[in-house]
A protein has these predicted regions:
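Short, solvent-exposed loop/turn segments at secondary-structure boundaries
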Residues: 52-54, 175-180, 210-216, 277-280, ...
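Residue-level signal for inorganic ion chemistry
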Residues: 42, 77, 104, 201, ...
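Contiguous mid-protein beta-loop-alpha structural module that forms a pocket-lining wall or clamp
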Residues: 314, 326-331
Length: 445
């Protein structure tokens, strides 16, 4: 078997990062990425919505048709939630749960031995999916080769204990499990030594970091430890729930400029009645007060969020309240999701389930408000100085640009010429010139 592989990732940034770690793991073992003619195909799935499940099923069928001889492995959250449904599709060789992804090289080897020595007509997949609720220790996908990028993701936590009434994630990710503090520090040292200037702390519920650790560590403790490391230019925080902003965390954000002025704080609904029905345990007033306080401490902070529309029982009056509340927050970006009914969650059996047409119509209306807010936020940086961390060279309409992000996570494009020096991985002072679809076109200061 030629050691060529392709990997397809669905879902959140954590899942994307885990997919990157999987690719690095296989590369470190002598495998080569070859998307055109792979002998191994890995599909790293998401199951947060029914649409995500459907996309994964469609991709499985298409890739099996296109690559009938390849070993096809399906892993991740959908595999964890319903391995039997995936097996029923046909053509899947390996199914691995969330925790078993790190064992994929072993599973591929075992499957190939099994196929060689036993009945070639046996179409049953090799399945390894452990009960996620029993997991008590953080496991990361260990990869020896660290990719040379300007930004690196450090997964510090997995799992969630919130059990919001609409959410399947605690059922497929399990309880909160934290990367031990010293391991987080050592992994960050390796990333900085490899040239990464920005570290992004990621996880499913990073505000709960340390809850399971024996020494009482928490997210502020970890942040303070990482900020002592030489070479760390930016520290970006992943998604943090509103209730997880302790006084210590707020003080750190105010005092430490290397913590990026970019906070993703899930809202989920802008109506108190809906928030209560979701089991979110805060009010719109508390959320607004948090944003107001953080914005006063660092005025140019980009606040981003997630919002669900069409939750069971959401009336037009509830939605109108949510629409007005989101408009008032003036957030830098909002990810809008129509509610997706997930079997096994309390919301799936709630009365007053809304039609897809109502959910789609409300999502479109809220998206327009969110885009207006985002454009106003970006506009204020035209003519202002920003720091661009160069990430990659891109071609757009025949022109070359250095693409990267500012500390407040604006997507920036710097036009390049043939004489432009090598700028990837460098931190550059730039000035905003004009808006483009996703961010700002900039020039060197």
């Amino acid at each position: 078997m030629d050691k060529t592989f392709a990997i397809y990732n669905f879902g959140c940034k954590v899942n994307q990062e885990e997919g990157g770690a999987l690719a690095a793991l296989f590369s470190s073992l002598g495998w080569r990425q070859e998307p055109e003619q792979p002998q191994l195909i890995i599909i790293n799935t998401c199951t947060v919505t029914a649409v995500a499940d459907k996309k994964a099923r469609n991709l499985i069928r298409r890739l099996r048709r296109e690559h009938p001889q390849a070993v096809l492995a399906v892993c991740g959250c959908y595999a964890q939630r319903d391995a039997a449904e995936i097996a029923a599709i046909g053509g899947v060789d390996i199914i691995a749960g969330v925790d078993e992804r790190r064992q994929l090289p072993r599973l591929v080897e075992a499957y190939c031995r099994q196929r060689h020595h036993h009945d070639a007509g046996n179409n049953d997949p090799l399945v390894e999916v452990s009960p996620i609720a029993t997991l008590r220790h953080f496991h990361r996908i260990a990869a020896d080769n660290i990719q040379p990028r300007a930004r690196a993701y450090l997964k510090i936590e997995d799992g969630c204990d919130q059990f919001c009434k609409y959410c399947i994630i605690p059922h497929v990710r399990g309880p909160v499990r934290s990367l031990p503090l010293q391991q987080a520090i050592e992994q960050t040292r390796l990333l900085l030594a490899a040239g990464h200037q920005e570290i992004v702390l990621s996880g499913i519920h990073i505000g709960a970091y340390g809850r399971d650790l024996p020494q009482g560590e928490d997210l502020p403790t970890l942040i303070k430890s990482l900020l002592t490391l030489p070479g760390l230019v930016r520290l970006r925080l992943g998604s943090i729930e509103p209730q997880q902003f302790s006084e210590q965390l707020i003080s750190l954000f105010a005092e430490q400029e290397r913590i990026c002025p970019h906070l993703h704080i899930p809202l989920q609904a802008g109506c108190d009645r809906t928030l209560e029905a979701m089991g979110r345990h805060y009010t719109t007033e508390q959320y607004a007060q948090l944003i107001e306080r953080l914005r006063a401490l660092r005025p140019q902070t980009a606040f981003t969020t997630d919002i669900i529309v069409g939750f069971p029982g959401e009336s037009e009056e509830d939605f109108a309240a949510s629409l007005a509340f989101v408009a008032s927050l003036e957030l830098a970006d909002s990810h809008i999701f129509p509610y997706s009914r997930r079997s096994g969650t309390p919301a799936a059996t709630m009365p007053q389930q809304l039609s897809n047409s109502i959910k789609s119509e409300r999502a479109a209306r809220l998206n327009q408000v969110a885009e207006n807010n985002a454009q106003r936020y970006r506009q204020q940086f035209v003519g202002k100085t920003l720091d661009l961390l160069g990430e990659e060279i891109v071609e757009i309409s025949g022109n070359s640009y250095l693409r990267g992000h500012s500390a407040n996570y604006l997507s920036l494009l710097l036009p390049l010429t043939e004489r432009s020096p090598h700028l990837q991985g460098q931190l550059l002072p730039v000035r905003g010139v004009e808006l483009y679809d996703e961010g700002l076109i900039v020039e060197r200061c």
